[in-house]
């Protein structure tokens, strides 16, 4: 759907034979939550393109964020709902940078300033208190329901600054480091 949308609008890599739309794709593993929900297909890709607009985007339990969860140390029943988030900055020098992130990690989401857990594995399915995942793992607690699969955090960073391949690589590294920061 996305490729067709771009091709119909002649957006892509120009060749002597015509424009070749280049589309990257990524998904989160959310079958434990979203097993009966829609799976990405051409129709959904086209619909996403048609719904795109300038300005703030919907956040939370939308799009790829629908099946996202946080803190899966003791399985999905004790995980917290994840989702889609975004941020944007426009500087005085007309530099624009935006980030769109689908938060679906195994571990906790921690406030870097206070160290407080914002979302993660709960002490019980009904609890509002969080287990500190890293500490629990260090104590070698039994990993009830643990699976190494299904823990994907996706991030896209965009800017209006012209960057060469080396600069793009550096931006990608910084974005990745930002995800891993404790």
Outline where the language-model segments fall.
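A structural signal for small-residue-enriched, beta-sheet-centric alpha/beta enzyme cores
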Residues: 4-182
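Glycine-rich, N-terminal phosphate-binding loop and its surrounding beta-alpha-beta segment
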Residues: 1
């Amino acid at each position: 759907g996305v490729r067709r949308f771009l091709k119909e609008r002649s957006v892509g890599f120009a060749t002597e034979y015509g424009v070749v739309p280049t589309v990257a794709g990524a998904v989160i593993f959310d079958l434990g939550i979203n097993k009966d929900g829609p799976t990405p297909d051409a129709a959904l890709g086209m619909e996403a393109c048609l719904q795109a607009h300038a300005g703030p985007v919907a956040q939370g339990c939308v799009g790829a964020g629908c099946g996202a969860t946080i803190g899966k140390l003791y399985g999905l029943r004790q995980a917290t709902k994840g989702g889609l988030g975004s941020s944007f900055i426009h500087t005085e020098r007309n530099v624009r940078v935006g980030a769109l992130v689908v938060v679906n990690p195994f571990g906790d989401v921690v406030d870097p300033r206070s160290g407080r857990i914002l979302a993660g594995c709960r002490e019980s399915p009904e609890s509002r208190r969080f287990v500190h995942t890293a500490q629990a793992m260090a104590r070698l607690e039994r990993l009830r329901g643990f699976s190494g699969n299904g823990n994907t955090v996706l991030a896209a960073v965009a800017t209006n600054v012209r960057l060469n391949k080396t600069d793009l690589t550096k931006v990608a590294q910084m974005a990745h480091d930002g995800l891993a920061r404790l």
